[in-house]
């Protein structure tokens, strides 16, 4: 039996977790980034694919402009609720679509070189890293790609691959000092 979808949100203070204001739309497989005082949650499944985006201010979630492509299992990169990226994910198959968040709205930007579902994501809007995930056809990949918004059109380029291909990873850190697990 599958667990029910939840909007539960918990905040870490360095020693303990505290239940805080729940997401307005309960879901799973959403992409999120930020801090305990400034975060963003986008997309997911509730149980249908959703494009819903919510912004966190440290005490409550507020629904803001939706992403352009509803999906689940996208990779996230961002440091707060004012800017960030989501990339890849799953609609009716794995996708390479990347969208950037300006603090107000989402814009589709250059796609990743490869489709991937449930990649690890880390970094910021300016410099992000997508690692591993599941490719079209269902196989796990170890490939990585780096995002650089300063390139003429903001683009992904190949980076060194992980040692082991896998999916459903979490990521943390920056583009140049990240972790995937």
Question: What are these model-derived regions, one by one?
Answer:
Residues 1-181:
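Polar, enzyme-active/binding microenvironments
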